[in-house]
Amino acid sequence: MNDLITNLALPQEVINAAGSNNGAGIGYGLVAVGAGLAMIGALGTGLGQGVSAGKAAEAVGRNPEAEAKIRLMMIIGMGIAETAAIYSLIIAILLIFVY
């Protein structure tokens, strides 16, 4: 019964690719999707760093005397936020090259 549903739902080329062991099967496709989803972490990091830099520029505009402290806190915050993007990149690379 399962073969009947598979044969009706999928073209023969897809079934052959899923059964082959040449790296082009559904398993590798799911790995690629997982790597892409892992890189969504970089999207959040980029947005967060952009907001952080904008707010720091506003704060320096309102209080120029505190520019050194504001810049230091912004750089520390961006460094902490960047670790999420680095971890996402490592996971994506591991998914692609280890599988």
UniProtKB/Swiss-Prot annotation:
GO terms for cellular component: plasma membrane; proton-transporting ATP synthase complex; proton-transporting two-sector ATPase complex, proton-transporting domain. Keywords: ATP synthesis, Cell membrane, CF(0), Hydrogen ion transport, Ion transport, Lipid-binding, Membrane, Transmembrane, Transmembrane helix, Transport. The chain crosses the membrane at residues 23-43, 78-98. The record marks E82 as: Reversibly protonated during proton transport. Pfam families: ATP-synt_C. GO terms for molecular function: lipid binding; proton-transporting ATP synthase activity, rotational mechanism. It is found in: Cell membrane. InterPro entries: ATP_synth_csu_bac/chlpt, ATP_synth_F0_csu, ATP_synth_F0_csu_DDCD_BS, ATPase_proteolipid_c-like_dom, F/V-ATP_Csub_sf. The keyword Transmembrane applies. Disulfide bonds: none annotated. It is a multi-pass membrane protein. Gene3D superfamilies: lithium bound rotor ring of v- atpase. F(1)F(0) ATP synthase produces ATP from ADP in the presence of a proton or sodium gradient. F-type ATPases consist of two structural domains, F(1) containing the extramembraneous catalytic core and F(0) containing the membrane proton channel, linked together by a central stalk and a peripheral stalk. During catalysis, ATP synthesis in the catalytic domain of F(1) is coupled via a rotary mechanism of the central stalk subunits to proton translocation. Key component of the F(0) channel; it plays a direct role in translocation across the membrane. A homomeric c-ring of between 10-14 subunits forms the central stalk rotor element with the F(1) delta and epsilon subunits. Belongs to the ATPase C chain family. HAMAP family: ATP_synth_c_bact. F-type ATPases have 2 components, F(1) - the catalytic core - and F(0) - the membrane proton channel. F(1) has five subunits: alpha(3), beta(3), gamma(1), delta(1), epsilon(1). F(0) has three main subunits: a(1), b(2) and c(10-14). The alpha and beta chains form an alternating ring which encloses part of the gamma chain. F(1) is attached to F(0) by a central stalk formed by the gamma and epsilon chains, while a peripheral stalk is formed by the delta and b chains. This is ATP synthase subunit c. It comes from Mycoplasma mobile (strain ATCC 43663 / 163K / NCTC 11711).
